[in-house]
Amino acid sequence: MNHSRSHALFVQAQTRIPGGVNSPVRAFRSVGGEPFFVARADGPYLFDVDGHRYIDYVGSWGPMIVGHNHPGVREAVQVAISNGLSYGAPCAAEVTMAETIARLVPSCQMVRMVNSGTEATLSAIRLARGATGRNYIVKFEGCYHGHGDSFLVKGGSGMLTLGLPSSPGVPAELSKLTITLTYNDFDAATALFEEMGHHIAAVIVEPVIGNANCIPPRPGYLQHLRTLCTQYGVLLIFDEVMTGFRVALGGAQALYGVTPDLTTFGKIIGGGMPVGAYGGRRDLMQHIAPAGPIYQAGTLSGNPVAMAAGLAMLELIQAPDFYTHLSNAAAALCTGLQQAASQAGIAMTTQQIGGMFGLFFTDQQVETYAQATACNTDRFNRFFHAMLQRGVFFAPSAYEAGFISSAHSPNIIEATLEAARTAFQTIANEAAILSKSETPIKMR
């Protein structure tokens, strides 16, 4: 593929934008090479500035659950724009959004809109500390909750991709207030709570890890956290920025039947526009200013254009059997990829929850961060580029989940699998040639 225009833009971008991108994973540092620059998107496709089309399984990192540029969302945005871009004052759409979230996710008795997932998690942690009078928070290896200082402690996603345990600029004193546990380890959680449960303000967790690829909870694990938190007066925060309205209409908490005290949202609730939210029990949310003393504010929070896009999206995903079709499409993709890898003699495991999935180049099921990092990342990188050359775009990191949309029809899935069969066989052939070249010559 000729990517001359993308290359020129990337060179230019690096003179004005750190690393040439506005979020690290976009730079392709993990997989090698240079990123392509997008000109437009429609349905299941991205189109780059060099005229290439890609079947997209990144979906803007999750929010495009009905496909790119859906006419229902686009028209809602056009109507909202005709009435103004930002008010700095309350509008009816933000009330409707709060009511909609509360109806679909009953644990959210009250909701506060913000501008990003990071802003939502930072606000939820401040609320938890203020409401409990405690300072310690607990997170899990491989979980990513945005770029807030309290979370950049053995973080996943971009941090994992860059291979850094933390970030310069995060005070050591603050890091000491974040305790990191192994996800899916029952005994580790129990031991920590027995030792210092009464000092912990909150446990924050991705109920399905999507930032160390796609790792679901072991049976009963989320309920175990719920039980411990209740016993010790600790707030349980589900970070559903990724899983919210993605794995089920009511999010992961509905799928697994576990009720958190607070929930953070992003991505899908903005319909592709910048947005975030956090919500939870009424008695907790009443601590937020101006109802209470815990401060949080935002000039663009509840932006009318973002609210219009999000409400249109939330309306579309309530269609009958929407999630059944979404899950079936993801299952067909994962089953087909698994079969294609197996036929080529390549060890790969797929894991899928609803409309999100993960590809692990290993022959084992992956339940922990350590297992995810032990997978064959070099082989993933080869697969990524082989698929990209064939017009299929997966996340440019072995540690990011993939996403499917309602626009990914059976024909799109089959086109993906056809490309994958060729890609896997090419990788297998390359490995065989390399193996032969490395075989020592026997001297007689």
Curated annotation (Swiss-Prot):
Organism superkingdom: Bacteria
Cofactor(s) required for function per UniProt: pyridoxal 5'-phosphate
Enzyme Commission designation: 5.4.3.8
Listed GO MF terms: glutamate-1-semialdehyde 2,1-aminomutase activity; pyridoxal phosphate binding; transaminase activity
Pathway(s) annotated for this protein in UniProt: Porphyrin-containing compound metabolism; protoporphyrin-IX biosynthesis; 5-aminolevulinate from L-glutamyl-tRNA(Glu): step 2/2
Keywords: Cytoplasm, Isomerase, Porphyrin biosynthesis, Pyridoxal phosphate
Entries under CDD domains matching the protein: OAT_like (cd00610)
InterPro entries per the UniProt record, alphabetical: 4pyrrol_synth_GluAld_NH2Trfase, Aminotrans_3, Aminotrans_3_PPA_site, PyrdxlP-dep_Trfase, PyrdxlP-dep_Trfase_major, PyrdxlP-dep_Trfase_small
Cell compartment(s), UniProt: Cytoplasm
PROSITE patterns, per database record: AA_TRANSFER_CLASS_3
SUPFAM superfamilies membership: PLP-dependent transferases (SSF53383)
Residues where N6-(pyridoxal phosphate)lysine is found: 267
GO CC terms, sorted: cytoplasm
Disulfide bridges in this chain: none
Catalyzed reaction equations: (S)-4-amino-5-oxopentanoate = 5-aminolevulinate
Stored Pfam families: Aminotran_3
Any one GO biological process: protoporphyrinogen IX biosynthetic process
Annotated Gene3D superfamilies: Aspartate Aminotransferase, domain 1 (3.90.1150.10), Type I PLP-dependent aspartate aminotransferase-like (Major domain) (3.40.640.10)
NCBIfam families: hemL, PRK00062.1
UniProt record similarity statement: Belongs to the class-III pyridoxal-phosphate-dependent aminotransferase family. HemL subfamily.
Quaternary organization: Homodimer.
Protein name according to UniProt: Glutamate-1-semialdehyde 2,1-aminomutase
Lineage: Bacteria, Pseudomonadati, Pseudomonadota, Gammaproteobacteria, Lysobacterales
Gene name as annotated: hemL
